[in-house]
Amino acid sequence: MLAYKISPSSISGRVSVPPSKSHTLRAIFWASVAQGTSIIHHALASPDSEAMIQACKQLGAKILKKSTHLEITGTPHLILPKNTTINAGSSGIVFRFFTALAAIFSEKITITESSQLQRRPIAPLIQALENFGATFSYEGEPYSLPFSVLGPMSSGYTEVIGEDSQYASALAIACSLAEGPFSFTILNPKERPWFALTLWWLDFLGIPYAQSEDTYSFEGKTRPQAFSYTVGGDFSSAAFLAAAALLSQSPHPTYLENLNIDDIQGDKELFFLLKKLGANITFENNTIIIFPSTFSGGNIDMDPFIDALPILAVLCCFATSSSYLYNARSAKNKESDRIIAITQELQKMGACIQPCHDGLLINPSPLYGASMHSHKDHRIAMALSIAAMHASGDSIIYDTDCVKKTFPNFIQILNSLHTNIQEHYEHISLRPADSRQDVVWQGSR
């Protein structure tokens, strides 16, 4: 089990942000079903990317890993052999996308996973696919992995709950490729920027669809042509570096390169929010410049950048006023229940943080070094790392292998910016720390 030992430290310097996971996975998928050979430059190398690659190879796609790009020849015939098993690994995108894709085939397809995906809900997507005529059978409890899917989907209309954007994204993919026409309505849509990213890919590939408010219609049976695409930097990953730069005691700024501010990624809005709250952030070409600075808290709607909940919770501990992070219920169904996970771990550091029905209440408070756990969630692990860098005393974060999911060189990049983080593969513990004052919650909402 990998653990981080982190001493208080500040960052400054210049760094290239790693490629976007969301764009990488969609690029690999669409190249695998496209007609011809596609080139994907700067794809993120991660366990989720590998899970997508292996799943797409079972479609018949030929995927070659070059030094700077992926060369992907799409499957000549969009079929899956009888009794194919797709292992989604720990990737929610592979899990949801291939569940929907399996529904277009007339052969039984089995979807399986790593144990971590067992907690990720799938029922709303399955129910929508059943309305199109797909059937599902389960080895255990209904709506739990592993399960088998038998299509094909038939044309029609369905509705899907919008709590998680991946349900609608998966439906859009299946409706594009299956023999249609199809239409669906998203009920109470959340995480709109992430579904917008899926629609951006449809537009980029020339796949037709029509939109009327939250209802989407597809002609179906549309395979894109091969394409060339360069994956830009990941704003979700950049958020952790930005937080470290804002809280830094260094007199120098940090330059985050490889970030296209015109990218559709939803988490870029976090940078505009922080600037609005008083953070000293400037945008220059494909670089975001972060100056150490103070900023206020506030009432913050998390839906536009739900993946930023853990790191924004950390930042709010250092704000000049209280914060209410709301509209964040979907964060409970990620790799962990992020509302509970970040609350439990930051409370170990002395944070004034409480969960509420749809988010978090946070009062500014000093943080102290502590022993913490990642909950096997990459965003929790990275958020706690940034908190530990700005706490009083050393900290340990256990079970941090999960960081490879989106940011494989996270520690290497931070240490290149002058931090003091050590990786250990054996059990480590902190020496007894100085006693700290008890923290009392002040105020409520």
Swiss-Prot record:
Where does it live in the cell?
Cytoplasm
A Gene Ontology MF term for this entry? 3-phosphoshikimate 1-carboxyvinyltransferase activity
Give binding positions for phosphoenolpyruvate: K21, G92, R120, Q166, R338, R379, K405
Q: CDD domains from the entry?
A: EPSP_synthase (cd01556)
Q: Which InterPro entries match?
A: Enolpyruvate_Tfrase_dom, Enolpyruvate_Tfrase_sf, EPSP_synthase, EPSP_synthase_CS, RNA3'P_cycl/enolpyr_Trfase_a/b
Q: Which domain of life is it from?
A: Bacteria
Q: Which UniProt keywords apply?
A: Amino-acid biosynthesis, Aromatic amino acid biosynthesis, Cytoplasm, Transferase
Matching SUPFAM superfamilies = EPT/RTPC-like (SSF55205)
User: E.C. number, please?
Assistant: 2.5.1.19
Q: What class of enzyme is it?
A: transferase
GO CC entries: cytoplasm
Pathway as given in its UniProt record: Metabolic intermediate biosynthesis; chorismate biosynthesis; chorismate from D-erythrose 4-phosphate and phosphoenolpyruvate: step 6/7
Q: What is the reaction catalyzed?
A: 3-phosphoshikimate + phosphoenolpyruvate = 5-O-(1-carboxyvinyl)-3-phosphoshikimate + phosphate
Residues of the active site are: D307 (proton acceptor)
Q: Is the keyword Transferase in the record?
A: yes
Write out the similarity annotation. Belongs to the EPSP synthase family.
Free-text function comment from the UniProt entry: Catalyzes the transfer of the enolpyruvyl moiety of phosphoenolpyruvate (PEP) to the 5-hydroxyl of shikimate-3-phosphate (S3P) to produce enolpyruvyl shikimate-3-phosphate and inorganic phosphate.
What PANTHER family does this protein's entry cite?
A: AROM/DEHYDROQUINATE SYNTHASE, PENTAFUNCTIONAL AROM POLYPEPTIDE
Quaternary organization: Monomer.
Q: What is this protein called?
A: 3-phosphoshikimate 1-carboxyvinyltransferase
Q: Which organism is it from?
A: Chlamydia abortus (strain DSM 27085 / S26/3)
**Upper taxonomic classification of the species?**
Bacteria, Pseudomonadati, Chlamydiota, Chlamydiia, Chlamydiales
